UniProtKB/Swiss-Prot annotation:
This is Tryptophan synthase alpha chain. The active site is at residues 49, 60. SUPFAM superfamilies: Ribulose-phoshate binding barrel. Its EC number is 4.2.1.20. The lineage of its organism: Bacteria, Pseudomonadati, Pseudomonadota, Betaproteobacteria, Burkholderiales. It comes from Paraburkholderia phytofirmans (strain DSM 17436 / LMG 22146 / PsJN) (Burkholderia phytofirmans).
Length: 270
């Protein structure tokens, strides 16, 4: 059983909701990426999404775009990100790590070489934003053969056919994009999210994580009421950008712990 599957099985057994923070590898300081990953885990992250910097991150809002640009300016590549996961695994063998990014860096490295290196480093899942599920059966199979969960995005505009396609090839969890547009946008409508989840659940036998537009513990709690997990990205990246260097890790841990407490109150209330 994969680390991701184990994690969600344990959460389900405890009646808890998953917390999935996102950070861009290499930003603000490539030398501290692993430290910040540990800070997220210390705060109560169930899964860590680690962003692979890319020059044209079309699905990301300005906060994550700029974060990606800063990481690229530091020379951070896909190989560096995989090396960060390997170092993280030296002292954390339990928290799943999902690489999130775009097709270009993987294709340049070669899918087979990527799968091999990612597996050896201890990567648990990969979410390629610009890979449509209809064209991804081979990629998904290659990842699963390497013990890596292929994770896919679904959106308010996803058709029943696309949802069913994801259900056939995805593993680990699915990431439901709660808003049309880019990451970091505002105006979350929890009732709209709640209305879409049953259609996903009926076709995809996996936990559903919801992200885009979740900026604080209160919003995270509301979203957790109707989902299996909450994904927070832009706010984490912003906190790292704004924090004094000496306080950055502690700031992350404190914020994640606040959200963790809010999510656990959902479980307690049930």
């Amino acid at each position: 059983m994969s680390r991701i599957k184990n994690t969600f099985a344990a959460l389900s057994a405890q009646g808890k909701k998953g917390l999935i923070p996102f950070m861009t590898a290499g930003d603000p300081d490539p030398a501290r990426t692993v430290e910040f990953m540990h800070a997220l885990a210390a705060g109560g992250a169930d899964v860590i999404e680690l962003g692979v910097p890319f020059s044209d991150p079309m699905a990301d809002g300005p906060v994550i775009q700029q974060s990606s640009e800063r990481a690229l300016a530091h020379g951070v590549s896909l190989r560096h990100v995989i090396a960060d996961v390997k170092r993280f695994r030296e002292t954390n063998d339990t928290t799943p790590v999902v690489l999130m990014g775009y097709a270009n860096p993987i294709e340049r490295m070669g899918t087979e070489a990527f799968a091999k290196a990612a597996k050896e480093a201890g990567v648990d899942g990969v979410l390629v934003v610009d890979y449509p599920p209809e064209e991804c059966a081979n990629f998904a199979e290659q990842m699963q053969s390497a013990g890596i969960d292929p994770i896919f995005l679904l959106a308010p505009t996803s058709t029943d056919e696309r949802i069913a396609e994801v259900g056939k090839i995805a593993s680990g969890y699915v990431y439901y994009v709660s808003l049309k547009g880019v990451t970091g946008a505002a105006n979350l409508d929890v009732s709209s999210i709640a209305s879409k989840i049953p259609a996903i659940k009926s076709r995809v036998p996996l936990p559903v994580g919801v992200g885009f537009g979740i900026r604080d513990a209160q919003t995270a709690r509301s979203v957790a009421e109707v989902s299996d997990a909450v994904v927070i990205g832009s706010r984490i990246v912003q906190l790292l950008e704004q924090a004094a260097p000496e306080a950055a890790a502690e700031t992350l841990t404190r914020f994640v712990a606040e959200v963790r407490e809010a999510l656990d109150s959902v479980a307690t209330a049930r």
